A protein has these predicted regions:
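Cleft-lining beta-strand/loop regions that shape enzyme active-site pockets
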Residues: 1-2, 26, 30-41, 54, ...
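Glycine-rich active-site/cofactor-binding loop and its immediate structural neighborhood
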Residues: 11-47
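Short, surface-exposed beta-strand/loop micro-motifs that present aromatic residues
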Residues: 9-14, 116-120
Length: 222
């Protein structure tokens, strides 16, 4: 059976009845050094949240004929977008290269939002780590945030939607390190003992979608 891969713009859109175009409500940023960004962030396009997309490849968008209609089988292809700037009637056509998958972009934005929310509403007293699975991705994601987030007075470890794997024991062994004191070093200042030990109390967040080794992690935490 033939597959028709959907072209994606790495954004959230909604139809605006007044403008008769699709408003850009959000543009996923993602990671600039590993995964592709949203096509709308391509240098020189000058497309921003609040702008509108009126046409795709010359096809006028309507409430019935959505961007998805005209991006079928257009993944990783260059397409033309007619864009209307926010608070302007001027229209211009730009060329963007669509992407096949935007889950990694959405995930990164979701994690960064959660972390920022936690820091802000705890007045920078609580750290946040999300572990997406107990495999290569989860192991890397854990260590990406671990060293910076354990310096806060408390820590939230989020394993919701964890896809499982086999590294829960390694992560739990690090999180279980009890800070006993500090070393006053000659050159490196004050270092916690043991090193890489959490500074304060921790809680874990889980849900019914944490499976396999993610479920074992949740049970072991209790």
């Amino acid at each position: 059976r033939r597959n028709y891969h959907q072209g994606l713009l790495g954004s959230e859109l909604s139809f605006d009845e007044k403008v008769k175009a699709y408003k850009i409500n959000n543009i996923f940023k993602g990671d600039v050094w590993v995964n592709p960004q949203s096509p709308l962030l391509r240098p020189g396009l000058n497309i921003n949240i609040g702008d509108y997309i009126k046409k795709i490849n010359g096809n006028t968008l309507t409430k019935k004929y959505t961007p998805g209609h005209f991006l079928v089988n257009q993944s990783n292809d260059e397409v033309g977008l007619q864009v209307i700037k926010k608070n302007s009637k001027n229209r211009r056509t730009v060329t963007v290269k669509t992407i096949k998958d935007q889950k990694s972009l959405q995930y990164r934005d979701w994690v960064e939002y959660n972390k920022s929310y936690t820091h802000k509403h705890s007045k920078n007293k609580i750290g946040y780590i999300h572990i997406p699975d107990m495999g290569v991705h989860g192991f890397a994601e854990f260590h990406r945030h671990f060293l910076s987030e354990i310096s806060y007075d408390g820590l939230i470890v989020d394993v919701r939607f964890n896809g499982g794997g086999h590294v829960s024991q390694l992560l739990l062994s690090k999180l279980a390190r009890k800070r006993l004191g500090f070393d006053l070093t000659r050159w490196m200042g004050v270092e916690p003992y043991p090193v890489e030990s959490p500074a304060g109390p921790m809680i874990a967040i889980t849900n019914e979608f944490a499976g396999s080794d993610g479920d074992i992690f949740s049970h072991s935490w209790k």
